[in-house]
Amino acid sequence: SYKVESKKELSLDDCLIMESLHKENAESKKLSYALKANQIYKLCKASNIEVFFLKLENKFIAARIISIEENISYDIFACNSFKSRLDGATQFLMQYIFDYLKNQNIQYFDFSRIPLGRKGAYGVYEFKKSTRGKLLQYNSEWVFFKNKKLRHLYYLYNLIINKKDFY
């Protein structure tokens, strides 16, 4: 049976597991990027980041990195092995995360970043639809800032200099 572990602090070994899981994910989805353990480690140092690991028979088969800001949570990265695509493992992990967030009084979960119409993303879009949440279309890139002042400055720069609104 499946077992979920939630972590707010990661070891480098945890990050190596995630790197390996994401490598399988990138291979199956033909992603143009790969997550590296040292990058994951740096990202997960932020106080608002939580990681959920899914195990089957004591073997890691999936992981999910999320960010929590007040009452909104954001999906950052999914690291799914080939095995996690079987028998609803990914759905099990997401249901666990949704229940966990609900118990923490987090009202929203934003899957982010993968828009409708992106080549090869139809399966992801269908998975998002199956959660029965509200569908929102983004009109720009997803950007993460540790410093909220920098986020606002970036927004103003895009609005005034680039003449585009990134929200």
Regions found by a protein language model. Give the residues of each.
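A conserved beta-strand-loop-helix scaffold within acyl/acetyltransferase catalytic domains
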Residues: 1-84, 100
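Short, contiguous acidic/charged loop-to-helix segments that flank catalytic cores in large enzymes
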Residues: 80-88, 115-118
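Active-site/acyl-donor-binding loops of N-acyltransferases
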Residues: 104-167
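Amphipathic coiled-coil/heptad-repeat helices and related helical stalk/stem segments
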Residues: 36-37, 94, 121
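Surface-exposed alpha-helical segments enriched in charged/polar residues
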Residues: 41, 95-99, 126-129
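Short alpha-helix boundary/capping motifs
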Residues: 33-34, 91, 118
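Conserved acetyl-CoA-binding loop-helix of GNAT-fold acetyltransferases
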Residues: 85-99
